[in-house]
Amino acid sequence: MKLVTFNIRCDFGQDGENCFCRRRDLITAKIRREQPDIICFQEVLPHVAVWLKENLKGYYVIGCGRDVNLEDEQVSVAYRRDRVNLISMDTFWLSDEPYVPGSRYACQSICPRVCTGAVFSYSGGPGKAYLFRLYNIHLDHMGGEARRLGLELILKRADRESAFQNIPVILAGDFNAEPDSPELAVLKSRREFTNVTEGIGCT
């Protein structure tokens, strides 16, 4: 199975030559070349989510906006229709009230942070189906404490999941943190997790 994480960058008008309208064809061309089974996107605005659904042929796209009206940025997950089946999906906010839309930690920026969680079945061939749990996140860009709390919330939820226990867990996204940061020490302390990006450098 091939999984990629992709901060698509918000469609800001001030980006000039690097605006989304100039990057769209490059994005679809890159995805066609790589042919990933799962794509974890970050910074997906509502109109970009529509564009992804219309232009990622052969993929389904799931996710929901982070603000109180379920709009604004989302952390979308795209998965191949021919190899991956969605078993269950959950959207929650990184906050003390995970199911209150738009909620956030007091120690973070003004931006709510949302997580797209899902259980998938991946077809590795005839008679070979593998279940796994995926969390796609975009941690706060300002508050290290908020990043730590967000990671701890996700790990606790993964530990408590009653359905489909003992299946592999994948945590992907934009962590907004350096490898040696205190917040990522939360993950390093969990020996059951492997950092598959180690050694590839910054992107």
Which role does the model predict for each range below?
Residues 32, 36, 53-57, 159-163, ...:
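Sec-exported extracytoplasmic/periplasmic mature domains
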